Amino acid sequence: MATITTPGYAHIQRQHGRCSTTAGRRGASNSVRFSARAVSSVPHAAAASSAPAFLPVPFVPGADAPSPSGKSAIGVPKAPRKGEEGKRLNFFQRAAAMALDAFEEGFVANVLERPHGLPSTADPAVQIAGNFAPVGETPPARALPVSGRIPPFINGVYARNGANPHFDPVAGHHLFDGDGMVHAVRIRNGAAESYACRFTETARLRQERAMGRPMFPKAIGELHGHSGIARLALFYARAACGLLDPSHGTGVANAGLIYFNGRLLAMSEDDLPYQVRVTADGDLETVGRYDFDGQLGCAMIAHPKLDPATGELHALSYDVIKKPYLKYFYFAPDGTKSADVEIPLDQPTMIHDFAITENYVVVPDHQVVFKLQEMLRGGSPVVLDKEKTSRFGVLPKHAADASEMVWVDVPDCFCFHLWNAWEEADTDEVVVIGSCMTPADSIFNESDDRLESVLTEIRLNTRTGESTRRAILPPSSQVNLEVGMVNRNLLGRKTRYAYLAVAEPWPKVSGFAKVDLATGELTKFEYGEGRFGGEPCFVPMDAAAATPRGEDDGYILSFVHDERAGTSELLVVNAADMRLEATVQLPSRVPYGFHGTFITGDELTTQA
């Protein structure tokens, strides 16, 4: 095993104007103003980890408005202009609003929250400090300066999702709680034509913007202990009085991005996806909440898997309130949905990601579970169940029901993300590649232990029911590897390489690594002192080909921010030799975010 570190690059210092949030809220003594101070190393998710949301609000598909295309099931309720909210409320609603606001400020904030302080996992001063802080929207900026040479084959849009709170928090806030914002760079003919960033216009954001303040509960930052119960009660009361409308969803769409069936979908697992369209001038516009033309009536997790061979999109949906706690389904290339397969679980479980092989889906059932009753005891509803044995379920992709699932125990294993999986017929094994995280619940709850994310090979023997597990990197080379991908043209098939963020110093990302999954050879690309980024996005040389010319024949795209200079860039790195090819100077600050994707030029022309 060898560890190879490639040099970073000579940074071109060029000052750009920073975006800053202009959204305010009515004064509250515990509101937090965003700053650009350096974030401390605390046990929340890595900058690029995606956001699991588990708002315990009954999911209501709702009767969404027609889309601009005329098809049903796409739409966001039109929000009134700011200042019109009070005009459309009747006397009872105005009185209820005043009473509930007084209850929130007088009891929830002053009695339940402020005297007790906040854990670091819910403290806005920690969670959204420095370059984790939000920015305002940026309309398309054109003709971006480029140092080096962008390979001419890269033709399309690199888009990355992230959490970007529109309003200052009024109480607890976790990095995962922010409103979704997509950042996009259009590349064509060796030039960086444009950059833009826009909020995904969720029903939640539109309503809060109309009211001029945050009103929906934040799933991780607020919903813990007695104050969390009180904030849930406030939410239900406001909805009952017609002050809020949860029927069009409560999600933030801040985690994943995928292009499927002519649509770029922004996702968080607490809601339906939202369709975002890339315009001809490189701008981003929200088409609306997308239910696959009336076929999808439940939330969908933020990491669906697109099979490169069949064109099918495979997905999961979990529920924290009622059974079935987990469902599996898939979509044909034309968007036709399969029947749901209800997967029996004894308790609601955090399932943020899963994997596919050529013939199977691989579903983790780990020890991080939801116990809403813990809020009654003053705790977090997300807990580590030490009595539970972690396991993986292997289910045929086109199974009629869960009776075809084979469960294999993998004790003391929690993989927040799974990078790939494949079948090895000679041994009746399914090989799963993921990052095993300890302490398993440290993203959500404070811990004195150092967080570790170990790249791991897990072998599931579906015949014997036994499993084995090995760390791919030796102890001498161990480094936290989180968020990344394999060559998407080989997803579900055996791969040699994975491209993963080096999540150190946690929770920042100081570079990315190319890992040989067979030998453990690690090649790092380091961003340099005071420079941090996020998820590496691998773009195959022929992004539309079913079979690449070489597995590592392509380029890595990643946003990077220089904390000393206050500037942000897009890097283009050769994945074969891990050398920098080009740097694109961006016109405004790009906060550390979550997951991204590359949309080819051909795909852009097929947008619905």
Curated annotation (Swiss-Prot):
A single GO molecular function term of this UniProt record: 9-cis-epoxycarotenoid dioxygenase activity
Enzyme class: oxidoreductase
Coiled-coil residue spans: none
Cofactor(s) demanded: Fe(2+)
Residues the entry annotates as binding Fe cation: H303, H352, H417, H595
Substrates-to-products reaction catalysed: a 9-cis-epoxycarotenoid + O2 = a 12'-apo-carotenal + 2-cis,4-trans-xanthoxin; 9-cis-violaxanthin + O2 = (3S,5R,6S)-5,6-epoxy-3-hydroxy-5,6-dihydro-12'-apo-beta-caroten-12'-al + 2-cis,4-trans-xanthoxin; 9'-cis-neoxanthin + O2 = (3S,5R,6R)-3,5-dihydroxy-6,7-didehydro-5,6-dihydro-12'-apo-beta-caroten-12'-al + 2-cis,4-trans-xanthoxin
Name the record gives this protein: 9-cis-epoxycarotenoid dioxygenase NCED3, chloroplastic
Induction profile: Induced by abscisic acid (ABA) and salt. Induced by drought stress. Induced by D-allose. Induced by infection with the bacterial pathogen Xanthomonas oryzae pv. oryzae (Xoo). Down-regulated by submergence.
Free-text function comment from the UniProt entry: Has a 11,12(11',12') 9-cis epoxycarotenoid cleavage activity. Catalyzes the first step of abscisic-acid biosynthesis from carotenoids.
Region (Disordered): 1-26
Transit peptide: 1-38
